[in-house]
Amino acid sequence: MSKRSLSSLGAEDLCGKRVLVRVDFNVPLGDEGLITDDTRIRAALPTINDLLDKSARVILSAHFGRPKGQVNETMRLTAVAQRLSELLGKTVVKTESCIGAEAKSKVDAMSNGDVVLLENVRFISGEEKNDTEFAKELASLAEVYVNDAFGAAHRAHASTEGVTKFLSPCVAGYLMEKELKYLQGAIDQPQSPLAAIVGGSKVSSKIGVLESLIDKCDKIIVGGGMIFTFYKARGLSVGNSLVEEDKLELASALEKKAQEKGVEFLLPTDVVLADNFSPDANSKLSKVDAISEGWMGLDIGSESVELFQNALKDCKTVIWNGPMGVFEFEKFANGTNAIANTLAELSAQGCCTIIGGGDSVAAVEKAGLAKKMSHISTGGGASLELLEGKVLPGVSALDDA
């Protein structure tokens, strides 16, 4: 699905134009109300700076938290406006509401190269309902639309989908374009062999991804808590490990489907067991067919790491979504860290490594390896849905290339 990008618009198209840019500024805040990680704000800078270079009037729209359609003083974008001003080296004017007379007057007062940040769009109930009247009023502030919020592209909300009916052209920003290039590209036209590493605690949250990837991958590597549902489906004893009893048949069906398609479907051969779920639990290594009663698996073992490393050796594209174990506990982070290091080494050898959102991004960042990967996705749910082969409303609403 090829979409028109901001790069197709020159200064002659944008000079003096009011451009509504949907960004993803849903950043973490600390106790003092200060931003603890500004990655998402920085990720939007290429798009914002390009518009400023082309003398546009930049109107930014963003959500923060889940205020449920009401004003929540702790969810205002004040800290974001301040940080963005520092990063851009210029004043960013923030509105008190994203629509209404005050927002309109601040937009009307803009000169070329100015930046206005509209207040949290989710303060208005019409945002998440994709209300046409709200979308129309939001769109009336601008003439051109740019969506650079990949992390919100799986939502059909007023600021991601509704506004496109009232603005033209509607194009993808540079972050959105990069996300689609890597994630969509890896699925539609991968350099093969293509491997997917799927982790996380529950099969249920990754069913769609696994089903979709079995059709596209040469190899699938499964780790994290969900492995125990597969083991139990095979008739193995899993002790106190996490199991989704209602997904046993599905686990068997997924393995069978992979086998029928000739896809290498790899599960760990050994696991690190713990006697309780805590960072200082007693631990021991065990083969998967000898898991002790009363113990639970919290990481993959060293033999499994080697098995997975060998399987990945010849791959040209690797997508990773979900950790191998409870990496938040140092004792059970080895499997996840080993995979992160392996992918960093593969990247250096020319393999395209894509970290597909969520906890695996946190794991790679914690290991200090983020810069060594080909692409780190900024979208959690959006990445997952794209990997599932779903159409993202915020993307399909943009102009075709």
Swiss-Prot record:
It comes from the Bacteria. Coiled coil: none annotated. Substrate binds at D24, F25, N26, R40, H63, F64, G65, R66, R122, R155. The keyword ATP-binding applies. It is found in: Cytoplasm. Pathway: Carbohydrate degradation; glycolysis; pyruvate from D-glyceraldehyde 3-phosphate: step 2/5. Monomer. Belongs to the phosphoglycerate kinase family. PANTHER family: PHOSPHOGLYCERATE KINASE (PTHR11406), PHOSPHOGLYCERATE KINASE 1, CHLOROPLASTIC-RELATED (PTHR11406:SF23). HAMAP family: Phosphoglyc_kinase. This is Phosphoglycerate kinase. The gene is pgk.
